[in-house]
Amino acid sequence: MGFPRGDVLSILDYSRENLEYLFLVADQMEKYLSEKKKLHLLDGYIVALAFLEPSTRTMYSFQSATYRLGGKTLVFTSETATSLAKGENFADTIRMLDSYSDLIVIRSKYEGTARYAAELAENPVINGGDGRHEHPTQAMIDLYTMYKIFGGIDGLTIGILGDLKYARTITSFLYGLTRFKPRKVYLISPGILRLREEVRNKIAELGLSFEETTSLQDVIDELDVLYVTRIQKERYPDPIEYERVKNLYRISIDTLRNVKKEFRILHPLPKIDEIDYRVDETPYAAYFYQAKLGVPLRMALLSLVLGVWRG
């Protein structure tokens, strides 16, 4: 058991044993945080946060994780804030960031950006989200949340609701689930937002049992977990298509009337109108706890990727 050093580009690069080891280290980080223990694992390290697409939770949780470990950050929050706006090519920007830091976390609206950056950089690169492709560290948090709430992932019945076509969080979440043995996975969306064929084929190839449906109410009473995503407005090339689908699903108090007692809702956030604000106050809402776990999980990830963890 252990966790490989180096780039974090796809959750498919990790085994179940790798992920479970990451969760154990995250548990230890969570304990340190609760004890207000000052850590020095990243003393002398600089983490570059190259966020060329808007972010709140991912960027700030990586920044907080770095600070909590004793490191420092360089933050680039948009293309306009760097020499990219002056015409500098992307490769030169990555080489510059690589020379200034010990690790790069990168987010971009373009698929494949993180992998290309990793080919250029000598230091590790972490994919903070690349277009509709993947968001591996969010999936690690999602899996860790279920691990914390249920004591494991095997045997759970999981529903995934919303924009299955464009949401990179769903792609990585499904890829992560292939490393475990959930009882069943329901993919819940209208045909226009159906999971992309290449993702569907990949999870089938990896042995994940799933069923597609358009009706949440037909399956919600079976679920242990409902993973909800917003409609990805920024990924829609056609605004008319977005207008057609933006309000197709909404979780209300009434939606939850027959759910299991232990049922929980996850959401990678931000949520817009897809969950009624009154649901936030119910015991079913686990998404704020999920967001809170982002810091200890990313603390664990940084310490393992950089090889400074000595647990």
Curated annotation (Swiss-Prot):
Q: Does the keyword Transferase apply?
A: yes
Q: Where does carbamoyl phosphate bind?
A: 57-58, 107, 135, 138, 269-270
What SUPFAM superfamilies does the record tag this protein with? Answer: Aspartate/ornithine carbamoyltransferase (SSF53671)
* EC primary class: transferase
What's a BP term from Gene Ontology annotated to this protein? amino acid metabolic process
UniProt-listed PROSITE patterns: CARBAMOYLTRANSFERASE
Per its record, the protein catalyses: carbamoyl phosphate + L-aspartate = N-carbamoyl-L-aspartate + phosphate + H(+)
Recorded hits in HAMAP family, A to Z, give: Asp_carb_tr
This protein is called Aspartate carbamoyltransferase catalytic subunit
